[in-house]
């Protein structure tokens, strides 16, 4: 583990040096900002272990260095944000550890006609086991470091004849516990005709991923092409071709997770800023869907509406190898309010979202309902005998746990996200809600994740601000199986921020977390009080 951590730290340093070196050649023509700061954070928690009973309080002291840097020039944009923190735990110094996070991106124009070198680096501390604790952080000392690096080339052209947005890159993901690791090529291309088209219009959308890990590989490909004739009327005919394939050495080879079809449709130009595409599609060959049934003809429909540069709506309905498929993308922005709603369905692999049920032990528990695991511990003087009529009524009870394992399967992911921000003169209100449904295409087991949060921030003086955070998180794992479990997290937080001067600030926060679970051993409460000082330079 230590060797792995050193290796990841070394990669982080090399990536940062490489990005800084690339941008250094352009410093003479750009604007460079460098903002370092020192952070001291003291957090008291009354239940650091996040357990139902025998809670242990702890004072978690964090000291770290934060660096935020931005470089902007005509041909280059570079952003770098990093924080290194060392945490000490008063209840158990064996947990003392250092934590690192990095978020960096580089865009360097190599050629005036749209060739751009791109690179990103992201290092974050995520929950070690999402099923055990979805809200794990540094204070709970139950996180794992996950690093993702990506570098490649973009080619973008936007003129009156045609529009092309394309990219090809190499992506590598490494985690501290080796779960969810992958590396491989990622490519995409989107193209459509320009405004000067008079006879033919087209749309091209293609994405491709080829990932591998531990001798296994997965290829994910999806393509859609529309080619039509421009007429003097508001109705224009077009041909549509669609192809999707997910292959490799993953999952169950007997299941079909591909679809291929062609069709004929019309584009109705409802107005200059909105059009509707409708096509009737015929499957190619005798391919089967994921349930083993022959794929049938279907109708594909898509609508696009853009009344202004600040408002855009796209929606579609179609059919893929698993049945009906939907997509939705809406964004709107004005002086005060920003809204964004996105719904998408995609196939993934090599993630940190695959769980299996393991029995971690057997305990003697009362025959009646068990509220805590402590009730399963028999006193030293107690004697259990099934032949004794005075037996207290104990039984052998298995303790089960959902364990995070390698995601060597394809999964269908349906994600809905809604983000809304209201900016008033002295108050900012943000609302976010997300819903993620994951279907294991091998076992057909479903998991769901729902999260909703409300943040209100109010400026009470020139240097002071108060805030209120309310969040609700719900996870449902192994749905419709004997091991199904639902966890609900309710968190409330109040904070006060004070800027003492231009480089020194003080934050005080009080929070309360309540978790309820179908497995009572995971039900707990936690209260925190934290104070943080940030000194900039």
Question: What are the roles of these predicted feature ranges?
Answer:
Residues 1-31, 537:
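Gram-negative bacterial Sec-dependent N-terminal signal peptides
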Residues 28-537:
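Gram-negative and organellar
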């Amino acid at each position: 583990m230590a060797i792995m951590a050193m290796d990841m730290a070394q990669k982080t340093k090399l990536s940062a040096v490489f990005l800084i070196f690339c941008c250094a050649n352009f410093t003479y023509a750009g604007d460079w900002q460098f903002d370092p700061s020192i952070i001291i954070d003291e957090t008291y928690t009354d239940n650091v272990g996040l357990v139902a009973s025998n809670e242990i309080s702890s004072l978690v002291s964090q000291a770290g260095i934060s660096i935020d840097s931005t470089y902007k020039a005509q041909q280059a944009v570079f952003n770098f944000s990093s924080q290194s923190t060392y945490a000490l735990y008063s209840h158990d110094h064996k947990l003392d550890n250092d934590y690192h996070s990095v978020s960096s991106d580089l865009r360097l124009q190599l050629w005036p006609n749209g060739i751009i070198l791109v690179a990103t680096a992201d290092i974050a501390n995520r929950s070690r086991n999402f099923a055990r604790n979805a809200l794990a952080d540094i204070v709970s000392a139950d996180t794992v470091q996950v690093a993702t690096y990506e570098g490649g080339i973009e080619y973008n052209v936007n003129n009156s004849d045609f529009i092309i947005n394309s990219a090809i890159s190499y992506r590598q993901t490494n985690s501290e516990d080796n779960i969810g690791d992958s590396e491989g090529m990622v490519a995409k291309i989107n193209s459509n005709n320009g405004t000067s088209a008079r006879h033919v219009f087209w749309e091209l959308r293609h994405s491709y991923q080829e990932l591998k890990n531990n001798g296994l590989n997965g290829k994910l490909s999806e393509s859609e092409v529309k080619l039509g004739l421009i007429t003097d009327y508001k109705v224009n005919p077009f041909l549509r071709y669609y192809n999707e394939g997910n292959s490799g050495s993953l999952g169950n080879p007997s299941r079909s997770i591909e679809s291929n079809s062609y069709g004929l449709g019309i584009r109705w130009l409802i107005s200059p800023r909105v059009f509707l595409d409708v096509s009737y599609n015929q499957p190619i060959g005798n391919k089967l869907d994921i349930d083993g049934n022959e794929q049938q003809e279907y109708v594909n429909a898509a609508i696009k509406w853009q009344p202004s540069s600040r408002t855009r709506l796209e929606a579609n309905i179609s059919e893929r190898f698993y049945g009906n498929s939907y997509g939705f993308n809406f964004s709107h922005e004005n002086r005060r309010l920003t809204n964004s709603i996105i719904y998408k369905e995609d196939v993934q692999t090599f993630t940190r979202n695959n769980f299996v049920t393991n029995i971690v032990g057997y305990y003697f528990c009362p025959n009646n309902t068990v509220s805590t695991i402590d009730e399963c511990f028999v006193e030293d003087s107690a004697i259990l005998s099934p032949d004794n009529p005075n037996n207290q009524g104990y039984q052998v009870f298995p303790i089960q746990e959902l364990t995070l394992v390698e995601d060597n399967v394809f999964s269908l992911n349906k994600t809905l996200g809604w983000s809304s921000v209201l900016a008033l003169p002295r108050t900012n209100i943000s609302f976010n809600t997300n819903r993620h449904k994951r279907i294991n295409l091998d076992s057909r087991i479903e998991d769901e994740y729902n999260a909703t949060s409300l943040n209100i921030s109010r400026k009470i003086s020139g240097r002071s601000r108060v805030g209120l955070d309310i969040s609700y998180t719900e996870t449902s794992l192994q749905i419709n199986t004997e091991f199904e479990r639902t966890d609900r997290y309710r968190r409330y937080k109040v904070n006060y921020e004070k800027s003492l001067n231009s480089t020194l600030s003080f934050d005080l926060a009080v929070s309360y977390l309540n978790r309820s679970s179908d497995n009572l051993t995971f039900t707990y409460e936690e209260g925190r009080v934290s104070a943080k000082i940030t000194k900039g330079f």
